[in-house]
Amino acid sequence: MVNIHVVIPARLKSTRLPGKMLADIAGKPMIQRVYEQVAKSKFKSIIIATDSQEIKEVAENFGAKVILTRDDHESGTDRIAEAVTKLGFADEDIVVNVQGDEPLIPVENIEQAAQLLIEKPEAVVSTLCERITEAEDIYNPNNVKVVFDKNNYALYFSRASIPFERGFSENHQVSISEFFRHIGIYTYRVGFLKHYAELAISPIEKYEALEQLRVLYNGYKIAIEQSAKPTPAGVDTLQDLEKVRKLFDV
């Protein structure tokens, strides 16, 4: 039987919003909000992987299982790879990476991402996306765009506006029907996750600062489909944090 685990990578020294994992959201730190959201699911286990003693203490105080990792990881995926190795998960097990800055992610989407990987044996990773509905989101580098093939395998992820609409000009109203925003949730097979950590950082991964590009660069498949439910964007900026706080205060 394949066990499905959730690991939440949590780094205190975020580049764009330092300390955001412990930012207060209606009386609770953000990492607790994320953990409680994930806990509504029925997966085998939920673990927080962090390089911060402060986050570890906070998380243990609200009852989470925590594992300390190195502080020099290039990405959350690398951090999770260390965690699953320490935890001794079997290669055939599945791990869902739920970002520690997505307190509003629907449980249905987490379960959907895990099921997608089970249904796509050719893929080593699965993830989700949703159609972009506002033109301004196409040009926001914090909204990662994705293009995928007819079989629902990702072709490329970018902070740029992909696909490019040929003939576009400032006076042209861009069609947004074919633009998709990547939702920052990943599901991996544990055996591949361990291998991922051994792969060199790819040039495109470094250029775009997108960890999933290491998978594509090395010739592996990422399965992707539109999410069952809308997913609010994660907390990357102070403005994002204020928006989330207002939603919890309602």
Curated annotation (Swiss-Prot):
Pathway: Nucleotide-sugar biosynthesis; CMP-3-deoxy-D-manno-octulosonate biosynthesis; CMP-3-deoxy-D-manno-octulosonate from 3-deoxy-D-manno-octulosonate and CTP: step 1/1; Bacterial outer membrane biogenesis; lipopolysaccharide biosynthesis. Its main location: cytoplasm. The keyword Nucleotidyltransferase applies. GO terms for cellular component: cytosol. It holds the Pfam family CTP_transf_3. One of its GO terms (molecular function) is 3-deoxy-manno-octulosonate cytidylyltransferase activity. It is an enzyme of class 2 (transferase). It is found in: Cytoplasm. Keywords: Cytoplasm, Lipopolysaccharide biosynthesis, Nucleotidyltransferase, Transferase. It comes from the Bacteria. SUPFAM superfamilies: Nucleotide-diphospho-sugar transferases. GO terms for biological process: CMP-keto-3-deoxy-D-manno-octulosonic acid biosynthetic process; lipopolysaccharide biosynthetic process. Its EC number is 2.7.7.38. It catalyses: 3-deoxy-alpha-D-manno-oct-2-ulosonate + CTP = CMP-3-deoxy-beta-D-manno-octulosonate + diphosphate. Coiled coil: none annotated. The keyword Transferase applies. Activates KDO (a required 8-carbon sugar) for incorporation into bacterial lipopolysaccharide in Gram-negative bacteria. Belongs to the KdsB family. This is 3-deoxy-manno-octulosonate cytidylyltransferase. It comes from Francisella philomiragia subsp. philomiragia (strain ATCC 25017 / CCUG 19701 / FSC 153 / O#319-036). The gene is kdsB.
